[in-house]
Structures are given as structure tokens and as C-alpha cells.
């Protein structure tokens, strides 16, 4: 049920790419369109409006005449950064692209791990079998 909801919000071709384009901070429409190679302006407009309705993006006017907006992620939108990193790493492995997500400081390919904030440690390999989805 939770996965179905998540996919209903972010499960089309462009939505996660729009969110990923906003992970580094607010963007104006033109900047975002340029960064998302191949997206039609009407598709970007539709996605941004829907993401705003879904509470993942916040639009802030930076010009009144004409009205122009800058787009930024809400807290809920920023929460998707981990999912985007996981999907990006998976895509890199499937396509043989050695340039999956990299650590900004040293350039090493990032790995994703399950982590328990209560125990303050990563889940061990044997523990993963006991994972429950709540």
C-alpha cells in the first residue's frame, strides 16, 4: 500500500528527475529545463504544479511582473534524496556506468546501507532477513 502511494506520486518518467534537479537548491524554470535534457516545457510545468500540490516542491515568486517562480524542495521532497541515490546507483550498475553517485569530497562511489537510528549502527547482513516493513 505504501509503495503504491509513493509510485502514484513519483512514479512517472520525469518526476524523480525534477526532484533530483532540485536537490542542490532552488532553481528557476529555465535553469531546471536546461538541466533536464529532453523535457518539454509543458511537461515540466505540469510536473512542477503537481509536485507543489503533493507538497514536495515549494514555488516562490522572484519577480512580480511578469510573475516568475523559483522552485525548491520541501522537507518531504528532500526526504526523497536517499531513494534517488539508491535508484541512481541501481541504474549505474545496470548500465555498466561506473559514474553512479559519488562522494563529493573524495570521489568514491557511494554505497547504500540500512541503518537503525535506535541502535545507531548499520544493519548487518544476517539481520536483513529479519527486516519488517511497517
Regions flagged by a language model, labelled:
Residues 2-39:
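N-terminal helix-turn-helix DNA-binding core of bacterial DNA-binding proteins
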Residues 89-134:
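C-terminal regulatory/oligomerization modules of transcriptional regulators
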Residues 7-9, 48, 72:
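Basic, helix-initiating cap at the start of DNA-binding domains
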Amino acid at each position: 500500500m505504501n509503495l503504491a502511494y509513493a509510485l502514484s506520486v513519483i512514479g512517472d518518467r520525469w518526476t524523480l528527475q525534477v526532484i533530483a534537479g532540485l536537490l542542490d537548491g532552488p532553481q528557476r524554470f529555465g535553469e531546471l529545463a536546461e538541466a533536464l535534457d529532453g523535457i518539454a516545457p509543458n511537461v515540466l510545468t505540469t510536473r512542477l504544479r503537481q509536485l507543489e500540490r503533493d507538497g514536495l516542491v515549494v514555488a516562490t515568486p522572484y519577480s512580480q511582473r511578469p510573475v516568475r517562480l523559483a522552485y525548491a524542495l520541501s522537507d518531504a521532497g528532500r526526504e526523497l534524496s536517499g531513494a534517488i541515490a539508491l535508484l541512481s546507483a541501481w541504474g549505474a550498475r545496470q548500465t555498466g556506468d561506473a559514474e553512479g553517485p559519488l562522494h563529493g569530497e573524495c570521489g568514491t562511489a557511494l554505497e547504500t546501507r540500512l541503518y537503525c537510528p535506535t541502535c545507531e549502527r548499520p544493519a548487518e547482513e544476517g539481520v536483513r532477513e529479519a527486516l519488517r516493513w511497517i
